[in-house]
Amino acid sequence: MFAKFDMLEEEARALVRKVGNAVDPIYGFSTTSCQIYDTAWAAMISKEEHGDKVWLFPESFKYLLEKQGEDGSWERHPRSKTVGVLNTAAACLALLRHVKNPLQLQDIAAQDIELRIQRGLRSLEEQLIAWDDVLDTNHIGVEMIVPALLDYLQAEDENVDFEFESHSLLMQMYKEKMARFSPESLYRARPSSALHNLEALIGKLDFDKVGHHLYNGSMMASPSSTAAFLMHASPWSHEAEAYLRHVFEAGTGKGSGGFPGTYPTTYFELNWVLSTLMKSGFTLSDLECDELSSIANTIAEGFECDHGVIGFAPRAVDVDDTAKGLLTLTLLGMDEGVSPAPMIAMFEAKDHFLTFLGERDPSFTSNCHVLLSLLHRTDLLQYLPQIRKTTTFLCEAWWACDGQIKDKWHLSHLYPTMLMVQAFAEILLKSAEGEPLHDAFDAATLSRVSICVFQACLRTLLAQSQDGSWHGQPEASCYAVLTLAESGRLVLLQALQPQIAAAMEKAADVMQAGRWSCSDHDCDWTSKTAYRVDLVAAAYRLAAMKASSNLTFTVDDNVSKRSNGFQQLVGRTDLFSGVPAWELQASFLESALFVPLLRNHRLDVFDRDDIKVSKDHYLDMIPFTWVGCNNRSRTYVSTSFLFDMMIISMLGYQIDEFFEAEAAPAFAQCIGQLHQVVDKVVDEVIDEVVDKVVGKVVGKVVGKVVDERVDSPTHEAIAICNIEASLRRFVDHVLHHQHVLHASQQEQDILWRELRAFLHAHVVQMADNSTLAPPGRTFFDWVRTTAADHVACAYSFAFACCITSATIGQGQSMFATVNELYLVQAAARHMTTMCRMCNDIGSVDRDFIEANINSVHFPEFSTLSLVADKKKALARLAAYEKSCLTHTLDQFENEVLQSPRVSSAASGDFRTRKVAVVRFFADVTDFYDQLYILRDLSSSLKHVGT
């Protein structure tokens, strides 16, 4: 099935030898790529030699000149604007200092440097104006470094003064950091992660008081931080100079002047190379060589020296390298004498593990590493609390993520995806009958974990390019292959095994050495900027090839070809008729994983089992309407958004059942009173929200109640009170949802209004049903108002906008201008009108039996004698509304994208994302409409005698 990869074991063994022989006894080693940022700091070091002041690394200055781009920038990154900002700012600073003091570099024309500075500063200004990923990319120390660089630039040239939208957010981050950190804390003996960024503290720190933190000449293995120390400490540190000279020669720059951003990365590379190879299927005998033992000893000694934990280098401890080191020693069978206990004691927090002490926000991949290290231990049950904690954290992070998962240590979403699948695959395999974690997790948690794995696998499959790679990136493609290989082990993904096998076969050619060509675009590991690690990349290539060559499938043809009536129905819709059969089936399989979770909530609001209605088959259908459209459009809204909307969809069906089966009989003689009940309930819940006393308002109804003012309540009185209680639970669920409470006031106001209209429309329809035609109203008026309000579309859309405002928008208003708001409300009205029309097309027969008002009952349709002709006429009107919706959405998108970007804590470009969410909701609405035309999806009332 797969291309035959010869000599893999020999290549892997050769890589182990290369890694083992790279370790310098004093300085360790690093194969991380050169970075402009650190090179610029090295270029700014000057020294007195024989009475003359000289640049210590003149080659580094020349390196900067060689690397400047045509647009004046230095090494911008396609996935991180922060990288370009840092590189360009640091390089401009170096050029400004050199043009003032050329020292021994007299052969470089000052005029040329000045022109380069002008181009560089112009580029920096443009980059700062466009900088919108300061939070998303989350580079180490960015909140400290960029403000410092801008100050340094202004000190060199008073005309430098940048204004940019994200400046306020950056300074807010800076203030929050400084509130938690005192530079004077570095004078103490205990090392701090801030030692990695001393260049951001010039003028705020007495560098003479931090020299005791030097280890083998470096400040926490950072050339830029060490350069700042060497420049500002007195006396001159020969130890620091020796370290930098070693990095200059032994680093990946090899004397060219380029400096890596971190040196050494000894433990990082040793652990990543070995664990990556062994996790993919290489055995100890495959890798056996003298260097293997020496590597294991080096790792074990690192644990001993740093008291049970390690870092990427000595005395730079973190949870990633500690967990990876534990995993490596376990896989080597040499974990005697090391334990997770020190890691847990140092890095465990309330609901996750810290990467390092003082961390601003948690890392997804760090917690993946912790979980993997614990799951591979023979005594894993001893660490069950930590296993549960990290599993919950990762699951919640995946479910909450809008779009692809992100992590601050890597710019490719494929890397954290791979790690999560590796960890969660172990969870699922070890939770099987007879396995050690069989009773460790409840069914709901395992369902959530399964959804994470399934989504990760499917989205990886869907993202593969025609050439077999992922985004044209060799290393990221290896992550994808390893994700698929791990997924292929699970029964959960059995139906997708043919697609997994085909994708891995297609990727095989990319991984062949002849096509393995990394570029700057493969610099996806992040620290202060971004970098590549040559030996780690080589390990991932071999691991992906090994995993592909080892994978065998036992495909059950019955599973892969299985279909059902609903799936066949979906394939007939315009929206899904062009979707490949396997992709459609995959979305059905993903949807099925949500069904048990949805059923857990079916009685949260309404006691549906006590209502005389047919079985709620729609529960099996609802998840697909959201999952299928999400996968089809590749929108990838958050899984939590999907599930919240599934529940709202379920409640939409249940509220229809409730009004028809319970409210209508109870209020048959007093419909006007039901309007009063609706207003009372909605007003009371809104008051609670406004007053922020949720759950504490006197008189709140939470269950079945009776009116205590009635001495001997009648059956009718009890029924009326219970209906009010049910309505209260429904309104509570919607308006007290955590994301609704954190949405902008504009979105909450719209939801309040639409929810009230929705409930009143049900009451109005109760009255209309008694005559099968509302007197004195035209069809046009009715279908755009009461009828449209009666379907759940408008309030569900408002609910979705609240979620988007609270999560992606961080509380921003979804629609910032009057034009945006008008157009989106117009789109919502077209959606609701179209939805009602299509609903009525599908329910003509049921509405006749149950005496429900339907569009075709209006006099305007009386000229058509056949029901089929009436349906066709209504379908043409629905098509007109859809064309209006399409046009309005296009106008809305144009309006949004022309509006200014709002600087806030919102991640990414909120403008483009909110357009995607609105279009996604419109797709789901359109899909429901297409289904309604093909089949009536609602439950039927059970009449007496049936």
Swiss-Prot record:
Keywords (alphabetical) are:
Isomerase, Lyase, Magnesium, Metal-binding
Q: Which reaction does it catalyse?
A: ent-copalyl diphosphate = ent-kaur-16-ene + diphosphate; (2E,6E,10E)-geranylgeranyl diphosphate = ent-copalyl diphosphate
Reported cofactor(s): Mg(2+)
> Where, by residue number, does Mg(2+) 2 bind?
656, 660
Per the Swiss-Prot or TrEMBL record, what residue ranges does the short sequence motif DEXXE motif cover? 656-660
Pathway participation? Plant hormone biosynthesis; gibberellin biosynthesis
Q: In UniProt terms, what function does this protein have?
A: Catalyzes the conversion of geranylgeranyl diphosphate to the gibberellin precursor ent-kaurene diphosphate in a two step process.
What's the protein called, per UniProt?
Ent-kaur-16-ene synthase
Native organism: Phaeosphaeria sp. (strain L487)
